[in-house]
Every structure is written in C-alpha cells, then in structure tokens.
Curated annotation (Swiss-Prot):
Propeptide: 52-75, 99-117
Post-translational events: O-octanoylated by GOAT/MBOAT4. O-octanoylation or O-decanoylation is essential for ghrelin activity. The O-decanoylated forms Ghrelin-27-C10 and Ghrelin-28-C10 differ in the length of the carbon backbone of the carboxylic acid bound to Ser-26. A small fraction of ghrelin, ghrelin-28-C10:1, may be modified with a singly unsaturated carboxylic acid. Also O-acetylated and O-butyrylated on Ser-26 to minor levels.
Lipidation (O-hexanoyl serine): S26
Lipid addition sites, O-decanoyl serine: S26
Compositionally biased spans, kind Basic and acidic residues: 31-43
Protein name: Appetite-regulating hormone
Membrane spanning stretches: none
Homology family: Belongs to the motilin family.
InterPro entries attached to this UniProt entry: Motilin_assoc, Motilin_ghrelin, Preproghrelin
Length: 117
C-alpha cells in the first residue's frame, strides 16, 4: 500500500494536471467558454461615479424631476469611449464647457491625422 505522502502527491499532481487541461480547453471548447461567461455575468456591474462630479451630474436637490423628460446623451470615441448623460437644465448650464471640450479633442485629432499619413 502506498504511503499517505505518495497518495497526497498523486492527488496534487492530478489536480494540477486537470487545471492545466481545463485552461487549454477553453480555446477549443465553446461549451467551456459559455460556462465561464455565465460565471462572470452573475454579478451586475456596479455603476461608478467619481466623487468630484457627484453633485454636478446628479444633483441631490430634486431639480432633475422637472427636466427628466428632456435628457441628453452624448457619446464620442476619441482614444477611448466616453459617454455623458445630462438633463436639459444641466446641458444649458454646462453646454459651453462641454462644447469646448469636444472641440479641443476633435481639433487635436484633426491635427494628428495628416501627420500619421
């Protein structure tokens, strides 16, 4: 009869070999990928918001209720994806700063485009 150390060693090696085989099969087996996707999708993504912008984007004074029907969503793709949702009142307050920001980014892209060619 093998010693307990040998049995434990064989079990450990078997588990490591199984993990290695499972890691290699995800590329070849679509079923294993589906299982991984199900495991990852169980937790809903948390909605993060920087603390410095908390009052600017979501006013706690209840003023959003009157302008909730005219909400504006802005999305653009510079070197990264950016999305902003503003109510009508918030857009009126910050439209100049937002326009300048977009203009600066698009102007930089236009300057860099001929240099790349």
């Amino acid at each position: 009869m093998p010693s307990p150390g040998t049995v434990c060693s064989l079990l450990l090696l078997g588990m490591l070999w199984l993990d290695l085989a499972m890691a290699g099969s995800s590329f070849l087996s679509p079923e294993h990928q589906r299982v991984q996707q199900r495991k990852e999708s169980k937790k809903p993504p948390a909605k993060l918001q920087p603390r410095a912008l908390a009052g600017w984007l979501r006013p706690e004074d209840g003023g959003q209720a009157e302008g909730a029907e005219d909400e504006l969503e802005v999305r653009f793709n510079a070197p990264f994806d950016v999305g902003i949702k503003l109510s009508g009142v918030q857009y009126q307050q910050h439209s100049q700063a937002l326009g300048k920001f977009l203009q600066d980014i698009l102007w930089e892209e236009a300057k860099e485009a001929p240099a790349d060619k």
